[in-house]
Amino acid sequence: MAMTYHLDVVSAEQQMFSGLVQKIQVTGSEGELGIYPGHAPLLTAIKPGMIRIVKQHGEEEYIYLSGGVLEVQPNMVTVLSDTAIRGQDLDEARALEAKRKAEDHIRNSHGDVDYAQASAELTKAIAKLRVIELTRKAM
């Protein structure tokens, strides 16, 4: 049996996941993080994107995160996010529309603030589409 640790993924609305996992992948403020059993304690910001969860028996789950905080403790990892949405619950049409609007906004931006906001929205839309794609492959 593979080594595991306990993971909690919590959004402002609800607990999205609680259980034993083999590993997770998430994008931290300094880049991609792979958290395996026995990882050194860590507290870091996470960027908008996805968390890839490899559960106790090898099944995979993908959850979109709007950003947040990752805390790694011995035998326990916690992810706190304002928004967390399971891959199968994401609306592809809405994500595609958000991506299109963000791209239009970038093309028509008139200043750093407009561009930064549109770029952040584009990043979120692309992350949602990636979660949808990976969720389909895992099913």
From Swiss-Prot:
InterPro entries: ATP_F1_dsu/esu_C_sf, ATP_synth_F1_dsu/esu, ATP_synth_F1_dsu/esu_N, ATP_synth_F1_esu_C, ATPsynth_dsu/esu_N. It is found in: Cell inner membrane. The keyword Transport applies. CDD domains: F1-ATPase_delta. Its main location: membrane. Belongs to the ATPase epsilon chain family. Produces ATP from ADP in the presence of a proton gradient across the membrane. This is ATP synthase epsilon chain. It comes from Pectobacterium atrosepticum (strain SCRI 1043 / ATCC BAA-672). The gene is atpC.
